[in-house]
Amino acid sequence: MKDVMKKTIAALMLAALLISLVSCGSSNKGETKTGATSSYAYLLDTSKMEKPELDLSNASGVLKSVLDSGVLTIATSPDYPPAEFVTEDGTVYGSEMMLAKYVADCLGVDLAIETMEFSGTFAAVDTGKVDMAFSGYGWKADRAEVYELTVGFVGEDEEDSTSNHTLITTVENEGKFNTLADFVGAHIYAQAASLQEMYVEDQILTLDTEGTTNLELVSTLDQAILGLQAGKCDAVALDEDTAKQYVAQSAGKFVLTNVLFDMSLYEEYEGTVALAKKGETSLIEAVNKIIEFVNEKNYYFDMYSVAKEQAGIEE
């Protein structure tokens, strides 16, 4: 019954997403502009969704600039379905993009999305090209030292909210990799600065006493997938849902290894986070209140479910 209810909620949200309506303005305290987010209205219609009460009267820094300009500009690398990806018609979509739309609407401003390589999202925040970045980030100690990170948000069932991470390989290598130890000596691709880079380092390279494993970092997941297809590597480390989508689109060329990284090592860092420039506490505090409300209402689970369906990711 619980699964039926979730599928019903997801179906209702999907129907709402197909109606490209302009959202209502924020009911927050303080002086803000009415949020239209007209360019990205297709992402999410929030007009009938509950929103948290925010006091923005003492906004400072980037948050004040956002409110004054009426636009929240975010960076993303849209190669990480279902969180962020490009649809067949060329539009940016995904659960994190829906969340960003909801955040903008709660602030009463428009949303603007800048797409770029994953490594570029950090530079865009550093240089002030964007206000925030939403791009499938996990909590990492080195990130927390140089950026303001939001509270975590999860797209899975609250009873099993830890996301899984795995590796994919070619159909020719099917059955070759059955444990993490089997990847010792292999040539593995992972996206630079990603969580998967950390997982490979922590759980595969540490098993390699002779240094025979080659972890190669690439700028984009597309590079990794093309490399795997061309035989330049043996496997690619990915989020499990993203892995399923790439395998489904490979026309039988790739397979899931079904080998999972041990996520119990990182339980205290559960969930995905967004980031802003270090010191922008006014912005992060406001966004955290919004995300906490999203978690309370389980909105992100619904967004994630819809995005998975749109990305063609099957359970």
Report the location of each language-model feature.
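Short amphipathic alpha-helical coupling segments at ligand-binding clamshell hinges
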Residues: 95, 99, 179-182, 186, ...
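A ligand-binding cleft/hinge motif common to bilobed small-molecule-binding domains
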Residues: 120, 136-146, 199-207, 229-230, ...
